[in-house]
Every structure is written in structure tokens, then in C-alpha cells.
């Protein structure tokens, strides 16, 4: 794979991450991780869901039981309710701790694979031309500018190519998002268009009394 394409794909990933949002990506990956049957936390998450369901049922039964008419049953349900609440709070604290660690690791990996890779490629290939400009088509200052900082004169450097890809992709993604927002807003307006109330026959009007 050519370096030109690698830089373009890397910038595309960076722009998509910026558009979607790092927090949203972390949440989606966390849910996906919990849904994997063999993952270490899948069992804990399933237990938490089961306890939540049991807790809601006990709370429903507790609310439906009178503490005066059925005190023994009410006291038993209250003890079970408190026990399940404590267990859920402990389980939630454990999962929250795992989630924080998971998000921290994702942030580190994402930085290495995006920003870190950007800096590394710019440093490692700073003197390598991405492609050459047609000879004699551009003035000296343009050739010097596009070859900044260390590429041969008359060529396009990796820094300039990276900046160009980033700028073009940002504009394209912004245009696509604007079209999506406009299309969605138009559809909502059509759905909310008021329906005229049933009145008299067409061509008739009410007369003032």
C-alpha cells in the first residue's frame, strides 16, 4: 500500500473519530465487549441484569403489600429489597471501575493509532516526496512551501499532503452532515404538517349572522 493512501486513510479515521465522538465510540465498544459471550465481564453483566430484574419485581411486590395488614410479608420483602439493592450497588461499582479502565485503555490505543501515528509518519518520512509537481509550472515560493519542511524542492511533503487530506475530508464530512441534517429536518417538517380540519363542502363559506 502506498504511503499516499496510508496517510489518506489515517486522516479519514481521525476525521470520523472527531465527527462521531470519542465518548460515543467508547460506549459502543463497551457494549459490544459486554455482549461477547467469552469476555471476562459478560457473566458479571448478565448477573447484574438478572438482579435488576429481580429487584424490580421485589420492589413491585413491596409496593403492593401493606405494612399494616401483611407485616410479616412486608418485612420479608423489605429485607430482600435492601439486600438486592446493596448487591446491585456493589456490582455497579465494580462494573464502573472496569468501564473506566476500559475507556482509559481505549483512549491510549486510539491516540497511538491516530495522533501518535500521524506524528511518527511525519517524522519518519519528512524527507520523502509524496509526489512531484510538474517542472516549471509553479513559482519558486510555491515549490518551497509545498515541500516544507524537508522534502526535495519541487515535490509535495508528507506534512502538506497530510494537511490537504485533513482539510478536504473535514469539508466533505461537514457537507455530508449538513445534507443529512437538512434531509432529516425536512422529513420531520413533512410529518408534522398540520392536517386541515373537516369543514363544509369545497367552494362554500360561512356567512356572518
Swiss-Prot record:
Subcellular location: Endoplasmic reticulum membrane
One matching Pfam family: CHD5
Regions of this protein lying in the Cytoplasmic compartment: 24-110, 173-209
Membrane topology reported for the UniProt record: Multi-pass membrane protein
GO cellular component: endoplasmic reticulum membrane; GET complex
Lumenal side: 1-3, 132-155
Top-level lineage group: Eukaryota
Database matches in InterPro entries: Get1, Get1_fungi, Helix_hairpin_bin_sf
Keyword Transport: yes
GO MF annotations in UniProt: protein-membrane adaptor activity
TM spans (from-to): 4-23, 111-131, 156-172
Gene Ontology biological process terms from the UniProt entry: tail-anchored membrane protein insertion into ER membrane
Region (Disordered): 188-209
Description of how the protein assembles with itself and partners: Interacts with GET3.
Biological role: Required for the post-translational delivery of tail-anchored (TA) proteins to the endoplasmic reticulum. Acts as a membrane receptor for soluble GET3, which recognizes and selectively binds the transmembrane domain of TA proteins in the cytosol.
Family: Belongs to the WRB/GET1 family.
Protein name: Protein GET1
Organism: Chaetomium thermophilum (strain DSM 1495 / CBS 144.50 / IMI 039719) (Thermochaetoides thermophila)
